[in-house]
Amino acid sequence: MLDVAIIGCGVIGAASAYELSHYRLQTAVFEAENDVADCTTKANSAILHAGYDPEPGTQMARLNVEGSALAKEICARLDVPYRQCGSLVLALSPEELPHLQKLYENGIANGVPGIRMLSAEETLAMEPNLAPNVVGALYAPSAAIVSPWDFALAMAEVAVRNGVELHRSCPVTH
């Protein structure tokens, strides 16, 4: 008898299986495709967002910032390549600066580490090949990239080694 059934083994299903595999639970993952991360996850942009987009005070804001830090820890634990490259949101006209200011304020309220506004000069010094009409940027150094396929596969492999059943080519219809 199963304690937990997880439907889908993209990055969310694999992460759920990985975390649950550390408990004494009978867990199974049912994946419709013939491999892990074979649908939406493998086409993901690979960006681990810093957390300045969600509305402050929401669960999404809290989970975005916590999840970004947790992903870094899991990648290190599972030897998944992780590149903390930061992110820039550019303003190409003065009219766009208030939007960046709002994102900055969200980031501060959400606890995004190291987030800051950059002048045009600071932005171009950081990324000299940008369009010369840049007037400023929002910089979030905690943003990172990771191969979503490698990340999901590593978590699924550990989950299976820890006793989670993985059923591939097994769509759930109801």
What is each residue range found by the language model?
Residues 21-43:
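Glycine-rich FAD pyrophosphate-binding loop
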Residues 25, 112, 164:
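Short phosphate-binding/catalytic loops that engage adenosine nucleotides
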Residues 31, 84, 119-120, 168-170:
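Short loop/edge segments at beta-strand edges and connector loops
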Residues 46-126, 135:
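Dinucleotide-binding Rossmann-like beta1-alpha1 core, especially the glycine-rich loop
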Residues 2-29:
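N-terminal Rossmann-like FAD-binding beta1-loop-alpha1 element of flavoenzymes
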Residues 138-174:
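Helical element adjacent to the flavin cofactor pocket in flavoenzyme catalytic cores
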Residues 37-38, 125, 174:
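Conserved protein kinase catalytic core
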